[in-house]
Amino acid sequence: MRGLRNIYNLGVKELRSLLGDKAMLALIVFAFTVSVYSSATVMPGSLHLAPIAVADMDKSQLSSRIINAFYRPWFLEPELITADEMDAGLDAGRYTFAINIPPNFQRDVLAGRQPEVQVNVDATRMSQAFTGNGYIQNIISGEVNSFIARYRDNSVLPVELAIRMRFNPNLEQERFGAVMAIINNITMLAIVLTGSALIREREHGTIEHLLVMPVTPFEIMMAKIWSMGLVVLVVSDLSLVLMVQGMLQVPIEGSILLFMLGVALSLFATTSIGIFMGTLARSMPQLGLLMILVLLPLQMLSGGSTPRESMPQLVQDIMLTMPTTHFVSLAQAILYRGASFSIVWPQFLTLLAIGAVFFTIALLRFRKTIGQMA
């Protein structure tokens, strides 16, 4: 009972110390409000309102159909220019795409020739250029084929494709961006808050006070883990309900309570990583440098940004030892696909095992650090 009381009292002390740290409070608020909203809306993964210009040298019915096929929300209204204005517009960054339809284009198409339509792409706008190139090719090909056939799909295919989008029928970026921002920020804040809590003790000289108190390194470490973990757990829950479901109107398919249980297991592992990094760093700038080395690989290689199957096999095997890989897997299964505990229990069990390993390593390192200070 005495040990539990010490853990509780030390945890309350950590919460009071956090309330006095205005920078950390601002980071918490930003991470689960502005960051979530911007990740969902500012940088869409699909093509959105791309500026496009067309130099129509043919002035035919077919060229008009092609021009009218570029419409919102994928493209802005095409700007009609001359061929001489094309290079200047691309150089000035006014257009991402500039299409040059040659003279006699319709006549050559109907005659069975193969006229060339020049599509110039500003590749400095990487996301739009990569996605829009395929869009434009499909649009032009579709309009030419339908013009030749006089109407679309006049031939009956032997096989009819029935395409249904599961879990995100309208392919909305908000569904993916908002949830992944919360997942990434949970990991980031768990490491930052626990690591900074330990460094704050060292910088303020209160670590020496703890050394003369009847508390063990285990109790000190557990207090930091439960207090900082509780903060991340509460604010992530509020962000999921108020920001994602409320402001962004993103539907959550599964149980939020089950997801929060997964968050708690993930926090057990990531807060232990934060404690370990706090013992290595001697100041907040050093902790920030360590964060770059640790956090970026955890976020980029966990399967949230890029499917794990697209990574080299060695990277996949290494990342299986990291908690973020399993956390992303269970979070996507619960929040996107409505998975129940019977489906995600392997990830829960793996997170618990990985958390126990990281906790043990961090505790041994923390005891060694405390012993050197004594």
Locations of the language-model features?
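Short, membrane-interfacial amphipathic segments enriched in basic
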Residues: M1-G11, L76, L314-T325, A374
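Extracytoplasmic/periplasmic domains immediately adjacent to an N-terminal transmembrane anchor
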Residues: M1-R175, I343, K368
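Junction motif at the cytosolic side of a transmembrane helix
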Residues: R2, I199, F276, L335, ...
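Alpha-helical transmembrane segments and their short interhelical loops
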Residues: T33-V36, P217-M291, L296-Q299, S342-F348, ...
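Transmembrane helix segments
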Residues: Y37-L47, A281-T321
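Membrane-interfacial helix-loop-helix junctions in multi-pass membrane proteins
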Residues: D84, F167-L171, P251, S302-F358
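Long, hydrophobic alpha-helical segments
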Residues: E174, A178-G195
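Transmembrane helix boundary and interhelical loop/hinge segments in multi-pass membrane proteins
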Residues: V192-M213, I225, I370
